[in-house]
Amino acid sequence: MEHTTQCKSKQGKPCDCQSKCGCQDCKESCGCKSSAVDNCKCSSCKCASK
């Protein structure tokens, strides 16, 4: 299930949602649509109510 944390952004660049991307970056760049596991693991992004 490693592919859930490593996803590609819309520009094709690899995006590590656990360490590199903020929660909003994870959603916008990596294509996550909710805080659940989608294209990447957004639940791993430290996301407060921002």
From Swiss-Prot:
Keyword annotations from UniProtKB, A to Z: Cytoplasm, Metal-binding, Metal-thiolate cluster, Nucleus, Zinc
InterPro entries from the UniProt entry: Zym1-like (IPR049529)
Cellular component annotations (GO), alphabetically ordered: cytosol; nucleus
Induction and repression of expression: Highly induced by zinc.
Residues annotated to bind Zn(2+) 4: C40, C42, C45, C47
Entry's transmembrane regions: none
One annotated GO biological process: intracellular zinc ion homeostasis
Pfam families registered for this protein in UniProt: Metallothio_Euk (PF12749)
Residues that hold Zn(2+) 1 according to the record: C7, C15, C26, C30
Binding site for Zn(2+) 2: C15, C17, C21, C32
Keyword Acetylation on entry: no
Chain sites annotated for binding Zn(2+) 3: C21, C23, C30, C40
Keyword Nucleotidyltransferase annotated: no
Major subcellular location class: cytoplasm
Cellular compartment(s): Cytoplasm; Nucleus
GO molecular function ontology, one term from the record: metal ion binding
Family: Belongs to the metallothionein superfamily.
Free-text function comment from the UniProt entry: Metallothionein involved in tolerance to zinc and cadmium. Binds four zinc ions.
Protein name: Metallothionein zym1
Naturally occurring in which organism (per UniProt): Schizosaccharomyces pombe (strain 972 / ATCC 24843)
